[in-house]
Regions:
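Switch/communication elements of ASCE P-loop NTPase nucleotide-binding domains
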Residues: 1-34, 232-358, 435, 532
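Charge-patterned, long linear interaction tracts outside catalytic cores
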Residues: 225-231, 380, 385, 474-539
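Flexible phosphate/Mg2+-sensing switch loops adjacent to catalytic phosphate-binding sites
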Residues: 34-59, 125-131, 262-272, 331-333
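Activity-critical C-terminal alpha-helical subdomain
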Residues: 432-506
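Conserved P-loop NTP-binding catalytic core
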Residues: 26-91
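RecA-like P-loop NTPase motor core
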Residues: 315-316, 321-429
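Extended helical coiled-coil dimerization/tether regions that scaffold
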Residues: 152, 158-275
């Protein structure tokens, strides 16, 4: 990572292509905020170098971590008192801690690590013992990174806590089981215990690498006779904990979580610690149904979370406001997210339905080609394939917009850093859509060329008829070509005898038989433009 500025909310799901720097970001957070006793010192390998030019490695690195109180005035509570000197009042009424780490690398390979706390203007605050304050900050807000075997091997120090708290975990589970059975929701004691057993198995799945090799305690691993049933019970328990008034259960769950963690490895968390949870690709080795239950459970933990994923399934379980796209640009990694202002309630509902629930994987795309309906989706995908363009491999998604409206999709794409291009018909509705695009582009003619293609015909059927495919329409309509009949009637009869999508596929297949030269020039130009947009967004 050369440069990155990342605003974090309570829940964050980070997505991006393989080269955006995921491992570097997670490594930096894990090393700088590790709950180990020693503060981290930078090494030569931590400094950025231009890809392929290791001799061009930088000599300076600079990281600022900003911590904000959850509510104005919270910085005064007991657990934050030792950090009194580090808090800075800001114009929005919140207090923040700006913790800066700098690395300086000398010619002889030695590296110096400097720490400071800053005021809101970026000037260092005069603090008595900076390292002591930094240790306290990390003790209160450590990072816990779930399941990345490679990384855990790198920082593992092999010490095992003397007394594993296995019996405490059993006690907490017992207490949670008793609490839950007083609100049974039609679950018997046995079923609750089976569900909790699945919960522990699940947490173990995520902590399997957190800690030393010898400390692999298997807690409550009596294999349920029917594992599927256990998962179902866990799902019901999740929902019980998640309803209003379930806060006490969440606190118990958090205690269970901390105990499990300590029983598994080398970590001792401060009693006041509120860890930041890093969850790397939680979909690994989990069936989609299990993933849904697992994700619900992780969301119940009252902790700030950063998850990374390549799973459309997981994105469909995540409000779009929590998703952050990271895109590598020439001089930095750009972070795109809706942000606190988000979308209007109606736009948010439309995007949730159209994208999150029905096309979650389109959030991974580099460019959206927005078309009016199903006909265009079939024709465009097929004709692009005939021209040798593989939209999937190029990160291009064809999305129909008639159902959700054009404006919310374009607004959302822009806020998320996704390139876009719109194809409209030449009828009245199409002209309105084109006007919408122009208004979004402030009537900039140059930008219009990049983002808008309008068919010089009423719709895709009329356009393809005039582009030399009239024989297909006559054949499907079962009307000989020499019979005098206007094209609107021929098209209408053809649609009546098959359907709009089937007719579209028929036309595209015919184009495939005739070869690339039969694909209309207007569409070829559009394909080139969309590919150009997508490649500009590629790493």
């Amino acid at each position: 990572i050369n440069r990155l500025s990342l605003m974090l909310e309570q829940n964050n799901v980070l997505i991006g292509e393989n080269a955006w720097g995921k491992s570097s970001l997670l490594d930096a957070l894990t090393l700088l905020l590790s709950p180990e006793s020693e503060l981290y010192h930078f090494e030569r390998d931590d400094f950025w170098f231009p890809p392929g030019d290791i001799n061009g490695r930088e000599h300076h690195l600079h990281i600022i971590l900003t911590f904000r109180e959850s509510l104005p005035g919270r910085h005064r509570v007991r657990r934050y008192r030792p950090l009194e000197a580090c808090w800075t009042p800001c114009t929005d009424g919140y207090h923040r801690i700006f913790y800066r780490l700098e690395g300086e690398s000398a010619e002889d390979g030695s590296v110096m690590t400097l720490r400071s706390f800053l005021d809101k203007d970026g000037h260092p605050i005069d603090v008595e013992d900076i390292n002591d304050q930094a240790r306290h900050l990390v003790r209160l807000m450590p990072v816990l990174r779930l399941r990345d075997a490679r990384f855990m091997r790198r920082i593992r120090n092999g010490t095992v806590p003397n007394v594993p708290n296995v019996e405490v975990t059993a006690r907490q589970l017992d207490f949670l089981a008793r609490e839950l059975s007083s609100h049974p929701q039609n679950l018997s004691d046995g079923q609750i215990r089976q569900g909790l057993s699945a919960m522990v198995q699940l947490l173990e799945h995520y902590f399997s690498e957190q800690g030393a090799g010898q400390a692999r305690y298997r807690l409550m691993r009596r294999r349920a006779s029917n594992e599927q049933r256990s998962w179902r019970y866990l799902d019901i328990i999740n929902r019980m904990i998640d309803r209003p008034g379930g806060r006490s259960y969440r606190v118990i769950l958090l205690g269970l979580f901390a105990t499990l963690l300590q029983a598994k490895g080398t970590l001792r968390l401060d009693k006041d610690a509120r860890p930041l949870l890093l969850i790397e690709d939680p979909e690994t080795r989990l069936h989609p149904i299990m993933l849904s239950v697992a994700w619900h459970l992780l969301n119940l933990l009252p902790l700030q979370r950063i998850a990374t994923t390549n799973s459309g399934e997981l994105l469909s379980l995540t409000p779009v406001e929590h998703v952050c796209r990271l895109v590598r640009e020439s001089s930095r990694v750009a972070a795109w997210r809706l942000g606190p202002s988000g979308l209007s309630t109606e736009d948010s509902r439309r995007i949730s339905f159209h994208i999150r629930f029905n096309r979650p994987s389109s959030l991974f795309a580099r460019c959206w080609l927005l078309v009016e309906g199903e006909t265009e989706t079939w024709v465009i995908n097929e004709l692009a394939r005939q021209c040798g363009h593989h939209f999937d491999a190029e990160g291009i998604k064809v999305i129909e917009f008639a159902q959700s409206g054009l404006k919310p999709l374009v607004k959302f794409a822009r806020r998320m850093g996704i390139e876009w291009h719109v194809l409209v018909d030449g009828d009245e509705a199409g002209k309105k859509y084109a006007a919408t695009v122009r208004s979004l582009l402030n009537n900039d003619r140059e930008a219009e060329r990049e983002h808008l293609t309008a068919l010089p015909a009423l719709d895709m059927e009329h356009f393809m008829y005039r582009q030399g495919f009239s024989d297909v329409f006559h054949r499907v309509a079962q009307i000989p070509e020499n019979v005098p009949m206007n094209l609107r009637k021929v098209i209408s009869k053809a649609i009546h005898r098959s359907s709009k999508p089937d007719l579209a596929i028929e036309v595209a297949m015919e184009a495939g038989r005739r070869g690339v030269d039969s694909v209309p020039t207007l569409l070829k130009k559009m394909f080139s433009r969309v590919l150009w947009l997508a490649r500009g967004r590629a790493d």
